């Protein structure tokens, strides 16, 4: 089990992916209900399928989570994906070098098209707290439930009908 220490921000309008930056397409599905103390996620990226289990460390604040990841085969991935009941999302991820860190920029597809967020991971809580974001980072949304991928996946599924009701 490892600690994940990160901060999350929106991406400022007008920001462009730097030339030569590499990225990859990701698909994620969430198996645990919103607000659960333990989050279960499956992810497909390139040739890998990964199961992730995250717990939230209330004592350390919103920036710190315990995380376990392990590879699963295609058949298990497909079965778990179907169990997610539509709480899925698709996004393209770029890794943008910063001076001492890497900014992970996610641009969402489908119902979330146009939404972009950036995360930076750190080796310690002190390092995370002292980080000064570059100008192209927008509002900080670390710890905001509305900006969690789990909530975004559920909101992508909630398509309004003609009367404005979600189904």
What residue ranges belong to the model's regions?
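Phosphate-end processing signature that detects enzymes handling 5′-triphosphorylated RNA
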Residues: 1-167
